[in-house]
A protein has these predicted regions:
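Alpha-helical and His/Cys-centered functional microenvironments
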Residues: 7, 16, 131
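Bacterial N-terminal signal peptides
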Residues: 10-20
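Aromatic- and Gly/Pro-enriched helix-to-coil junctions and flexible linker segments
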Residues: 22-154
Length: 154
């Protein structure tokens, strides 16, 4: 009986932590970045630099597009048209809108950055597709970071 109460208490604490984490992300997303000018996500940068990251095959991993078009995860991507190797303009705009759910402008704790990053490099351990990036020095991870921080094409 005592073990059951303890297990219930742990479940309650875990649920509270989970809900608090979700609420803090929503709060962070609703607040502007703490830089001199609030970061804004740039569509042109997204299309040119971020979408290719979702299409890249990395050793030992599926491409992001493989799982994130059919799953019900917070990051959902539009499926590629049959026979296409990339998205068309309309699909890219839809992806841009969808990605904003996990890319809070100016927030380095954004799930887009933390989720696919190896835990040893500062990522979180809960990504079903494995740790796509082993280091914060990975050029593709740096493209995601630049996007979240508001980079634009020059």
């Amino acid at each position: 009986m005592h073990q059951m109460k303890r297990a219930s208490a742990y479940m309650l604490v875990g649920a509270c932590v989970f809900l608090a984490a979700g609420g803090s992300l929503k709060q962070a997303q609703s607040q502007p970045a703490a830089s001199s000018g609030a970061a804004k996500l740039d569509y042109a940068f997204f299309k040119a630099k971020v979408e290719p990251v979702f299409l890249t095959k990395r050793p030992g991993h599926a491409r992001c597009v493989v799982c994130h078009t059919i799953n019900n995860a917070p990051l959902h991507l539009v499926p590629l048209s049959p026979g296409s190797a990339s998205w068309n303009e309309e699909q890219s705009r839809q992806n841009f809108e969808l990605v904003q759910r996990v890319a809070a402008p100016g927030l380095l704790e954004s799930p887009l950055l933390k989720h696919p990053l190896a835990q040893e490099a500062g990522g979180d351990p809960h990504h079903g597709g494995g740790q796509q990036f082993s280091s914060q020095a990975d050029p593709e991870w740096l493209a995601l970071k630049a996007f979240v921080l508001g980079a634009t094409l020059k």
